[in-house]
């Protein structure tokens, strides 16, 4: 079994990259710096155990959420997740 772990520096770098990707692609609906202003869900409320749900929603979309699977690379999606988790509270 292979287990990958993130060092603190790598996670911070990923979260920083994720912040940029988020602001370019997600902030219109989910709010700048994860502060929602409309009907879109508050992503800060996504708990760590909801990563599979997050991935499915980003890749496949649902309702008002468009599918980003062919637009955002897996690494970019992971960076967005790191950013969301770094801001969760």
Question: What is the meaning of each model-derived region?
Answer:
Residues 2-21, 50, 88-89:
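Electrostatic cytochrome c docking/interface patches
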Residues 37-46, 59-89:
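Axial heme c-ligation environment in periplasmic c-type cytochrome domains
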Residues 15-19, 23, 31-62:
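Gly/Gly-Pro-rich "capping" loops immediately C-terminal to redox-active cysteine motifs
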